[in-house]
Amino acid sequence: MAVVPLRRLGIVGTGLIGASIGLAAKRAGVGEVVGVDADEGTAQLALDRGALDAVTDDVEADLVVVAVPVAQLPARVRDVLEQTREATVTDVGSTKGAVVAAAAGDTRFVGGHPVCGSEARGPANANGELFQGATWFLTPTAHTDAERYRTLHSFVSSLGAQPIAIDPRAHDRLVAMTSHLPHVLANVVLNQAGATRIEGHDPLAAAGGSLRDATRVAGANPRIWVDIFLDNAEALQAALGEHRRRVEQVEEALAAGDAGFLARWIAEASENRRSMLADAYPDATDLHRLRVHVPDRPGVLAGITQALGAERINIEDFELRHVSAERGGTLTVLVAGADHAARAAALLEAQGYGVVVSAVDE
């Protein structure tokens, strides 16, 4: 599908996502980007950052993106549809049921959800590269005008994202499983550990990598996540019910001493994780993990990444796990190719770092 630059783009809500869309759109050749925000200071900051050409209540445009919090989306989408005559209208919400219903079959509306983001907030942290390679769900309905869908598909592609069409209800079930359920479980596990004392010992103080890895998303911004949970309550409840059934299977296996079931269960999870990595990284079968012990010292991360970059060793992904000021931490680096992994390990060992290399699928 050909990428056709828009003449005018309107953005309603100029926070992190809205301002990032503005920056990316201007790089993609959109003629004019205008925006509005309930907080005038936020809109002005987006303008100062170069994400907007003008701040205006008149967002009539070829395309209007509504990028406000989930709870506000239905009302704001209705407002934009009423206030504009020609614009194709979309949103960026992570749940689709309520906002699609609010559009009431208007042929100009096409739901959207860029699967990306950041723990940072506001236009000060906007990034025009935020959508590069990201999945961007589009949720057309039977009422959606085909030409308007093509307009949005083309625009999303021009930002570097990968547009994927999906039924709105299927979208909400999908994100309930892949995003909302993990957030719920991370909070449950961490709160369970925080509320427990075992013969005077605090589980949080004794936490190892497993607890930290499993609860990375716990405690996310409640102003955002309470609305997401409630807006997708039906799909999330269904996902929790299926989760409960699977946990009960594990409980039954433990009670019966069923080692065979537990072994098959773990093997199935291992295969599913390999499949997930293969989707995220096309060369996942050749990915290698380098675990590097690093001191708690300014500049260590920059030094390692720059050293690998100088040798043209591409870092596919990395994670830094801090232990303490005295013990430093562990830097985990993913590198594609056994040769690159060996070269990276040798380079870092020559600089005095302890390195352990393993294939990701081991």
Regions inferred by a protein language model and the residue ranges of each:
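NAD(P)+-binding Rossmann beta1-loop-alpha1 motif at the extreme N-terminus of oxidoreductases
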Residues: 1-55, 63
